[in-house]
Protein backbone atom coordinates (compact mmCIF):
# COMPACT_ATOMS: atom_id res chain seq x y z
CA UNK A 1 0.00 0.00 0.00
CA UNK A 2 2.85 2.37 0.86
CA UNK A 3 4.56 1.68 -2.46
CA UNK A 4 1.47 2.54 -4.50
CA UNK A 5 0.83 5.75 -2.56
CA UNK A 6 4.51 6.70 -2.99
CA UNK A 7 4.28 6.04 -6.75
CA UNK A 8 1.08 8.06 -6.96
CA UNK A 9 2.61 10.98 -5.06
CA UNK A 10 5.73 10.88 -7.26
CA UNK A 11 3.56 10.86 -10.37
CA UNK A 12 1.49 13.83 -9.17
CA UNK A 13 4.60 15.81 -8.18
CA UNK A 14 6.23 15.04 -11.54
CA UNK A 15 3.12 16.21 -13.36
CA UNK A 16 3.06 19.44 -11.33
CA UNK A 17 6.77 20.00 -12.06
CA UNK A 18 6.23 19.55 -15.82
CA UNK A 19 3.33 22.04 -15.72
CA UNK A 20 5.56 24.49 -13.83
CA UNK A 21 8.28 24.18 -16.48
CA UNK A 22 5.79 24.75 -19.29
CA UNK A 23 4.60 27.99 -17.66
CA UNK A 24 8.06 29.56 -17.96
CA UNK A 25 9.04 32.43 -20.26
CA UNK A 26 8.28 31.93 -23.94
CA UNK A 27 11.22 33.79 -25.40
CA UNK A 28 12.13 37.44 -25.50
CA UNK A 29 12.52 39.56 -22.43
CA UNK A 30 9.98 41.23 -20.25
CA UNK A 31 11.84 44.53 -20.47
CA UNK A 32 11.67 44.45 -24.26
CA UNK A 33 7.96 43.73 -24.12
CA UNK A 34 7.43 46.70 -21.83
CA UNK A 35 9.35 48.99 -24.19
CA UNK A 36 7.23 47.88 -27.12
CA UNK A 37 4.09 48.49 -25.10
CA UNK A 38 5.26 52.02 -24.26
CA UNK A 39 5.95 52.75 -27.92
CA UNK A 40 2.52 51.50 -28.92
CA UNK A 41 0.80 53.56 -26.23
CA UNK A 42 2.66 56.72 -27.22
CA UNK A 43 1.57 56.45 -30.87
CA UNK A 44 -1.42 58.56 -31.80
CA UNK A 45 -4.09 57.24 -34.15
CA UNK A 46 -3.58 58.37 -37.73
CA UNK A 47 -7.18 58.27 -38.90
CA UNK A 48 -9.93 60.37 -37.43
CA UNK A 49 -13.50 59.18 -37.07
CA UNK A 50 -14.61 61.08 -40.17
CA UNK A 51 -11.79 59.63 -42.25
CA UNK A 52 -12.60 56.14 -41.01
CA UNK A 53 -16.27 56.65 -41.81
CA UNK A 54 -15.51 57.90 -45.32
CA UNK A 55 -13.17 54.95 -45.86
CA UNK A 56 -15.92 52.57 -44.80
CA UNK A 57 -18.40 54.32 -47.12
CA UNK A 58 -15.99 54.18 -50.05
CA UNK A 59 -15.46 50.45 -49.51
CA UNK A 60 -19.20 49.83 -49.47
CA UNK A 61 -19.76 51.88 -52.64
CA UNK A 62 -16.88 50.08 -54.35
CA UNK A 63 -18.47 46.75 -53.46
CA UNK A 64 -21.87 47.92 -54.71
CA UNK A 65 -20.37 49.05 -58.02
CA UNK A 66 -18.55 45.75 -58.42
CA UNK A 67 -21.75 43.77 -57.79
CA UNK A 68 -23.65 45.98 -60.25
CA UNK A 69 -20.97 45.46 -62.88
CA UNK A 70 -21.05 41.68 -62.41
CA UNK A 71 -24.85 41.45 -62.48
CA UNK A 72 -25.55 43.78 -65.43
CA UNK A 73 -25.32 40.92 -67.93
CA UNK A 74 -27.89 38.80 -66.11
CA UNK A 75 -30.44 41.51 -65.39
CA UNK A 76 -31.15 44.16 -68.06
CA UNK A 77 -31.44 47.70 -66.82
CA UNK A 78 -35.01 49.05 -66.49
CA UNK A 79 -33.71 52.56 -67.21
CA UNK A 80 -32.24 51.63 -70.60
CA UNK A 81 -34.77 49.33 -72.31
CA UNK A 82 -33.92 47.82 -75.65
CA UNK A 83 -35.06 49.76 -78.68
CA UNK A 84 -38.17 48.30 -80.20
CA UNK A 85 -38.95 48.07 -83.87
CA UNK A 86 -41.86 50.07 -85.35
CA UNK A 87 -43.94 46.86 -85.58
CA UNK A 88 -43.81 46.48 -81.83
CA UNK A 89 -44.56 50.16 -81.21
CA UNK A 90 -48.02 49.81 -82.70
CA UNK A 91 -47.29 51.50 -86.01
CA UNK A 92 -48.87 49.52 -88.82
CA UNK A 93 -47.55 49.35 -92.32
CA UNK A 94 -49.83 51.36 -94.64
CA UNK A 95 -49.91 49.77 -98.05
From Swiss-Prot:
Expressed in roots. Residues 1-24 form the signal peptide. Residues 25-73, 90-95 form a propeptide. GO terms for biological process: cell differentiation; positive gravitropism. The keyword Zinc-finger does not apply. The modification Sulfotyrosine is found at residue 75. Residues 72-95 are annotated as: Disordered. It comes from the Eukaryota. GO terms for molecular function: growth factor activity. Residues 80-95 have a biased composition (Basic residues). The modification Hydroxyproline is found at residue 86. Keywords: Differentiation, Growth factor, Hydroxylation, Secreted, Signal, Sulfation. The keyword Nucleotide-binding does not apply. GO terms for cellular component: extracellular region. 'Golven' means irregular waves in Dutch. Belongs to the RGF family. This is Protein GOLVEN 9. The lineage of its organism: Eukaryota, Viridiplantae, Streptophyta, Embryophyta, Tracheophyta. The gene is GLV9.
Amino acid sequence: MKKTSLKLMTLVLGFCFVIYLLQGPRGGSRNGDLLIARKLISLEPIETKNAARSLKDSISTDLEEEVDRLMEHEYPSPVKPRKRTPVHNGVRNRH
